[in-house]
C-alpha cells in the first residue's frame, strides 16, 4: 500500500510541467521543468537554424511544414493563449516548436530576425 502511494506521488509530481524559454544571442532554447524541481533541455537551436517565427495559425507556416516534421509542443494548452511556432532546420531535420512568448521576447525576436519574424 505504501509503495503504491509513493509511486502515485512521484507520477503526479512529474505531471506538473512548466516551460522556460531562453532567447539569447539569436539562439533559442526551451527547458522543461518537471515537478518544479528537475530541469530538462527540450529544444535548442542556433540563429542560423531558424527559418521562420510566426503565430501558430499563420498561413506563412504552410510553406515550411513538411511531412515527417518533428513537432515539439511547449505550450500551456490554455484557451486563448498567444501561441507562436518556430521552424528550424539542422541539416535534413526540420523541427516545429510551439511556444508562448511574452511581449519582451517577441520584441527581441523581431529585432534579431526582422525578416523571419511574422
Name every feature range the model reports, one short phrase each.
Residues 1-16:
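Alpha-helical transmembrane spans
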Residues 24-41:
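Membrane-cytosol interface motif
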Residues 26, 33, 48-50, 55, ...:
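Generic structural motif
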Residues 40-48, 95-101:
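Short amphipathic beta-strand/extended segments with alternating polar/hydrophobic composition
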Residues 42-62:
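Structured surface patches comprising rigid loops and adjacent beta-strands/short helices at the edges
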Residues 62-74:
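Charged, amphipathic alpha-helical segments
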Residues 71-118:
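A membrane-cytosol interface segment of integral membrane proteins
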Amino acid at each position: 500500500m505504501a509503495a503504491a502511494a509513493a509511486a502515485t506521488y512521484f507520477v503526479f509530481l512529474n505531471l506538473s510541467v512548466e516551460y522556460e524559454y531562453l532567447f539569447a544571442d539569436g539562439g533559442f532554447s526551451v527547458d522543461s521543468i518537471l515537478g518544479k524541481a528537475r530541469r530538462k533541455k527540450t529544444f535548442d537551436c542556433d540563429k542560423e537554424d531558424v527559418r521562420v517565427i510566426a503565430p501558430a495559425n499563420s498561413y506563412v507556416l504552410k510553406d515550411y511544414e513538411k511531412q515527417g516534421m518533428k513537432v515539439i509542443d511547449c505550450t500551456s494548452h490554455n484557451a486563448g493563449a498567444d501561441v507562436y511556432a518556430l521552424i528550424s532546420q539542422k541539416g535534413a531535420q526540420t523541427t516545429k516548436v510551439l511556444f508562448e512568448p511574452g511581449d519582451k521576447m517577441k520584441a527581441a525576436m523581431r529585432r534579431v530576425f526582422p525578416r523571419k519574424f511574422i
